[in-house]
């Protein structure tokens, strides 16, 4: 639970993302779920060129159809791109989250400081939160890319069926609490875990 009216407003997607990065205070892993072409990884590197960052993606496109509202519909396989190249401090993990996250967890213990969830789908967000639940601790910052339709457009009219829904279920299932941190003009928002 949390009061979204108290979130810091940042107008642009890039400025919003970089503002969220500056709010991370916890020591722990920094992660991105849904790297795709790596735009937000590049934004991270602008601010923190030496930060170790763990990025996950199938690089095969969406694992299932995604209906986000109005006539905007993506099919399984849409959004596939080649895996980008980054400096060695950016660790990339190829595969579906259901396979790559358990493998990653077996070698990476301890708290997660930051997760950028840009995996679009309810199922992908749910997998992320459930798989990483024991490493998401008070102080972990969660940033979402398609979270709420702040613009009230038809393009993301189905927002409540995806990242929002997965987060609400995770909060209830695990008796967690969050505090809003930021939002932008479109769909992005972030929060910090407090319980």
Spell out what each predicted region is.
Residues 22-195:
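S-adenosylmethionine/decaboxylated-SAM
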């Amino acid at each position: 639970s949390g009061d979204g009216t108290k979130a810091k407003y940042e107008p642009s997607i890039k400025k919003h993302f970089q503002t969220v990065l500056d709010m991370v205070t916890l020591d722990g892993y920094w992660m991105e779920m849904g790297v795709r072409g790596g735009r937000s990884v590049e934004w991270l590197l602008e601010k923190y060129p030496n930060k170790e960052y763990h990025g996950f993606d199938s690089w095969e496109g969406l694992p299932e159809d995604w209906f986000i509202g109005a006539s905007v519909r993506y099919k399984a396989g849409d959004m596939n791109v080649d895996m980008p190249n980054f400096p060695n401090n950016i660790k990339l993990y190829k595969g579906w989250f259901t396979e790559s996250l358990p493998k990653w967890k077996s070698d990476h213990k301890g708290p997660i400081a930051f997760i950028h969830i840009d995996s679009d789908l309810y199922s992908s967000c749910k997998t992320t939160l459930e798989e990483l639940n024991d490493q998401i601790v008070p102080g972990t910052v969660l940033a979402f890319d398609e979270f709420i339709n702040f613009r009230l457009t038809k393009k993301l009219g189905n927002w409540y069926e995806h990242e929002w829904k997965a987060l609400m279920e995770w909060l209830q299932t695990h008796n967690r609490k969050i505090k809003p941190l930021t939002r932008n003009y479109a769909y992005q928002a972030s929060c910090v875990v407090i319980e």
